[in-house]
Amino acid sequence: MKIKEILCELIACGRNRTQYILEYLTSLGLAVDVQEYLPGHKNIEFVTSNDKAKQDIIFFVHHDISLKTREGANDNTSSVAVLLALAKSIRGKAFPYNIRLVFTDNEELLGALSPSTTAEKLQQIMPHVGSFMYLSKFPDKKNIRHIIVMELSGIGDSIYVASQSGNVMTDVSLNKKLLDIAERNNFQSVQLKLPSTDMLSVKVFRVSGTVIGAIPYYQAQNYVMQGKMFPAVWQNIHSEKDNLFAIQEKALEMMKDFLLHILEEL
């Protein structure tokens, strides 16, 4: 099954994609953990364990979508589809680390925040956010080597690695490793600042992390050089323009291939 076909099936589920994610993973014979932290809100996790591994690499993708869109194809159904395809590719394989693929809920609450959001307001919001609740219950956070958040994986011919997400700085050392992996394996890549606050949960728990995704290379280059003009592909998120029509199979496959290289080389 092509990754875009997985994405189509996810979109057909409407706003609740949890059942599809569960059924897809269990159909592969994979053991899945479900964390229901509030009524109707679920994180879903698949772990490829290594008995000798002492550290964890975690991939976060949020499966909820903005209320302003019916499909949320790029933000963030594309990343969900890529991670499901990755799960199929790595089942039965052993890696130097425990690899945790985590599909989180209610992250769009953070996407709606403004820079002026008060600390008090954040304290009220965070217990509703899937990544925060997942990390709050993680048994031994010092064993987390890295967290890689995936956002906007469905459009573009290059990989972006975020130097900053909203007001949160990402891990400089991790970013360099990822950019080096991209260069060694002939992926076009660019480092840039993201306006969204996808790293907030990671920051709260003081864990190494960053954000990656796909982006048209020349749009990214113009954004990096000019600093103010958002890439056109970002202007369509949280709107009805964020739909299946714009999604590119090549971008989805590129992201999955990059993730496989990360698992082998990080």
Where are the predicted features?
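Active-site-proximal beta-strand/loop segments in catalytic clefts of secreted hydrolases
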Residues: 48-49, 60-63, 103-107, 150-153, ...
